[in-house]
UniProtKB/Swiss-Prot annotation:
Extent of the signal sequence: none
InterPro entries tied to this protein: MFS (IPR011701), MFS_dom (IPR020846), MFS_sugar_transport-like (IPR005828), MFS_trans_sf (IPR036259), Orgcat_transp/SVOP (IPR004749), SVOP-like_MFS_dom (IPR047969)
Keywords linked to the UniProt accession: Cytoplasmic vesicle, Membrane, Phosphoprotein, Synapse, Transmembrane, Transmembrane helix, Transport
Top-level taxon in the UniProt lineage: Eukaryota
PTM-bearing positions, type Phosphoserine: S25, S31, S542
Taxonomic placement: Eukaryota, Metazoa, Chordata, Craniata, Vertebrata
GO cellular component, one term: basal plasma membrane
UniProt GO BP: xenobiotic transport
GO MF entries: transmembrane transporter activity
NCBIfam families: 2A0119
Protein's name in the database: Synaptic vesicle 2-related protein
Record topology, Vesicular segments: 109-122, 178-180, 231-238, 338-373, 423-424, 479-489
Ranges that cross the membrane: 88-108, 123-143, 157-177, 181-201, 210-230, 239-259, 317-337, 374-394, 402-422, 425-445, 458-478, 490-510
Membrane topology term: Multi-pass membrane protein
């Protein structure tokens, strides 16, 4: 039988058994010549020693040795003091993101009246923030994959802090339009906090812990409304913008403690730094560090857009893009619709609601009243039960079904707004709808980092976040401009979009429930070799048969 010769450089030489397991004998080590036995195929290998202290690639690691991967270390160390600190720190960035988003629904009617802006300019003020977010999301994902999760997150937060405070001093509409767009550019990188956070979490706690960060989003939205209740009547919107940057300032002060992702360090070839980070976590948690050598997955390129469209991930990427688009489109649309519908007053019947909304959306504007703020606060509080419901069902139903359920319930509540309802029922329906659309967002933030491997995790999340910003960019023209023409059509657009998103969730090819974070998009090298060896053996047999 023909023998194939393989030259392996800087890799330990092992004997691959037929089952894919490896074994190393003293005779092999002494002779320096080794064999790979795969379905009767004998392949000669040349032994090459590793440098002292070098990390052993996973595909060539001897399972009888004491070796571990980052995933093994994170699982062994578990959830403890370190993760609680990390939760609070990354949660501050998440809280700030929520406040910057929530402020749009408060700032828009205020400037509409104060600067006598037409409806399209009010909508543009909201959209420009999402233009900035959309244009930067992929950029921040690339930065995080190339230079580190910590680096990308720090730069984006400091950028947002600077332009957020500067926008409070905008003298005219054009200035605040540009400055809020730059704020949006910085906010596009804040979702990378989820990537960093997820890579330090053990598998069993990952979904619950990522949802824990979502609690900070809920806190941020509620805090923004409460802040507006006290600040707007006395100090005005400029002080509201300044005070809304406080969580970003706290993050900037405390970020020196934030570690770089150990998974990223391993992928970058910084094994010593990764081990130091893991030892730090083990010390803080009071847990033992795994013994042995750190092993790494197959080295591959990082942060390449084409990796999101390989046959394995193509449909996942496209479906996730639509899911994120629909989620942001509906979530931010509901946030903007809430203030518009509350300003319309206590209405009964679609036709009367339409007239009321048209009156309130005209240039004869009206500032948000105390009652409007209180109702806005009630609907904002729905973020908390949304987190709790998602937390309860996501590990029972799985990620895909959770997203689908949230989209369906939001769509149903949107359709109920077609019938005659009073202000109290309107508030209740908006409360339920917001709880579940925020739950869908939370489930997407759990699913997306889990489905992509380490090499493209930040880029995958960044592109999904970018598609979400496209939806958020469009939604002001539906919730604030189209609403003037047709309440029916506006509600139908949001309801239909979420029904399609529910279907997209069901068609996702991968369910990540109970699955560890993937280090590589490739199969293990040994498995690939077994596949090739078996294929080669089959070919040899078939050729022999044909010759006979």
């Amino acid at each position: 039988m023909e023998e194939d010769l393989f030259q392996l450089r800087q890799l330990p030489v092992v004997k691959f058994c037929r089952t894919g397991e490896s074994a190393r004998s003293e005779d092999d080590t002494a002779s320096g010549e080794h064999e790979v036995q795969i379905e009767g195929v004998r392949v000669g290998l040349e032994a090459v020693e590793l440098d002292d202290g070098a990390a052993v690639p996973k595909e060539f690691a001897n399972p009888t040795d004491d070796t571990f991967m980052v995933e093994d270390a994170v699982e062994a160390i578990g959830f403890g003091k370190f993760q609680w600190k990390l939760s609070v720190l990354t949660g501050l960035a998440w809280m700030a993101d929520a406040m910057e988003m929530m402020i749009l629904s408060i700032l828009a009617p205020q400037l509409h009246c104060e600067w006598r802006l037409p409806s399209w300019q009010v909508a543009l003020l909201t959209s420009v923030v999402f233009v900035g977010m959309m244009s930067s999301s992929t950029l921040w994902g690339n930065i995080s994959d190339q230079y580190g999760r910590k680096t990308g997150l720090k730069i984006s937060v400091l950028w947002t802090l600077y332009y957020g405070i500067l926008s409070a001093f905008a003298p005219v509409y054009s200035w605040i339009l540009v400055l809020r767009g730059l704020v949006g550019f910085g906010i596009g990188g804040v979702p990378q906090s989820v990537t960093l956070y997820a890579e330090f979490l053990p598998m069993k706690a990952r979904a619950k812990c990522i949802l824990l960060i979502e609690v900070f989003w809920a806190i941020g939205t509620v805090f923004e409304v409460v802040l507006a209740v006290f600040v707007m009547p006395s100090l005005g919107w400029r002080w509201l913008l300044i005070l809304s940057a406080v969580p970003l300032l706290l993050f900037a002060v405390l970020c020196f403690w934030l570690p770089e992702s150990a998974r990223y360090d391993v992928l970058s070839g910084n094994q010593e730094k990764a081990i130091a980070t893991l030892k730090r976590i083990a010390t803080e948690n009071g847990a033992p560090m795994p013994l042995g050598k750190l092993i790494i997955s197959r080295q591959e390129d990082r942060g390449k857009m084409r990796d999101l469209f390989t046959p394995h991930f193509r449909w996942t990427t496209l479906l996730l893009w639509f899911i994120w688009f629909s989620n942001a489109f509906s979530y931010y649309g509901l946030v903007l619709l809430t203030t518009e519908l509350f300003q319309a007053g206590d209405v009964c019947g679609i036709s009367s609601r339409k007239k009321a909304v048209e009156a309130k959306c005209s240039l004869a504007c009206e500032y948000l009243s105390e009652e409007d703020y209180m109702d806005l606060l009630w609907t904002t509080l729905s973020e908390f039960p949304g987190v709790l419901v998602t937390l309860w069902i996501i590990d029972r139903l799985g990620r895909k079904k959770t997203m689908a359920l949230c989209f369906v319930i939001f769509s149903f509540c949107s359709l109920l707004l077609f019938i005659c309802v009073g202000r109290n029922v309107l508030t209740l329906l908006l409360f339920i709808a917001r709880a579940f659309i925020s739950g869908g967002f939370q489930a997407a933030y759990v699913y997306t980092p889990e489905v992509y491997p380490t090499a493209t995790r930040a880029l995958g999340l960044g592109t999904c976040s970018g598609m979400a910003r496209v939806g958020a960019l469009i939604t002001p023209f539906i919730a604030q401009v189209m609403l003037e023409s047709s309440v029916y059509l506006t509600l139908a657009v949001y309801s239909g979009c979420c029904l399609l998103a529910a279907l997209a969730s069901c068609f996702l090819p991968i369910e990540t429930k109970g699955r560890g974070l993937q280090e590589s998009s490739h199969r293990e090298w040994g498995q690939e070799m077994v596949g090739r060896g078996m294929h080669g053996a089959d070919v040899t047999r078939s050729n022999s048969g044909s010759q006979e």
